Every structure is written in C-alpha cells, then in structure tokens.
Amino acid sequence: MTRIKRGYIARRRRTKIRLFASSFRGAHSRLTRTMTQQRIRALVSAHRDRGRRKRDFRRLWITRINAVIQEMEVFNSYNRFIHNLYKKQVLLNRKILAQIALLNRSCLYTISNEIIK
C-alpha cells in the first residue's frame, strides 16, 4: 500500500486560516500556530461582542428616550412612560421611539399626550 502524505489537505487548511488572518499584525498573520490562536480569539470576541452590541444599542435608545422625556416634563421618568405605553397597548419598541425622539419630537409629544388621556 502506498503512503499518503496529506500535504494538500494541511496546506488547504492553512491557507484558509491565512486568508482569515491576513489583516492581523506581526507574527499573527505569518506564523501558523499564532494564526490559529488569533483566529480562535477573534471568533470568540466576535461572538461575545454581538451580544454586547445588542445591549449597548438598547442602552443608547433608552438614554435618548429618557432625555426627551425629561424635557417634556409630562412624565417624571422613562419607566413611567414605558409603563403607560404598555397599559395603553401602544406597540412601539425602544428603537422606534428613539428614532422618533431624535427626528420628530412633536410626534413623541402627541404620543405622550394620547397616553395620558
């Protein structure tokens, strides 16, 4: 039986990793061992930060809504505003409310006046 050297398979795997790590700095883009380690680390960071990005955007939306609500002086706080939204069954999420707060404050004023009634 002939000996199989699996050179092509290993080279194909390394080139795939090398393409991924080509933008890394220093030895992380040149040496195979450090390339594989940095690839794993990059994928872990990407997975972790996808969840973090969702949290950060939610915090940003809440901050924007709260800032406009503090100016309106109709509601004392953000949580009362959201509570009254749910009570009146107004189905607007925080992302849409933040966009309305930035782009069209008068519309947010009318929404808050409808909630109070």
From Swiss-Prot:
Keywords for this protein: Chloroplast, Plastid, Ribonucleoprotein, Ribosomal protein, RNA-binding, rRNA-binding
Domain of life: Eukaryota
GO molecular function: rRNA binding; structural constituent of ribosome
Keyword presence, rRNA-binding: yes
GO CC terms in record: chloroplast; ribonucleoprotein complex; ribosome
Entry keyword annotation includes Protein biosynthesis: no
SUPFAM superfamilies: Ribosomal protein L20 (SSF74731)
Record's subcellular location: Plastid, Chloroplast
InterPro entries noted in UniProt: Ribosomal_bL20, Ribosomal_protein_bL20_C
A Gene Ontology BP annotation from the UniProt entry: translation
Record-stated family: Belongs to the bacterial ribosomal protein bL20 family.
Functional note: Binds directly to 23S ribosomal RNA and is necessary for the in vitro assembly process of the 50S ribosomal subunit. It is not involved in the protein synthesizing functions of that subunit.
Alphabetized HAMAP family for the sequence: Ribosomal_bL20
Protein's name according to its UniProt entry: Large ribosomal subunit protein bL20c
Gene: rpl20
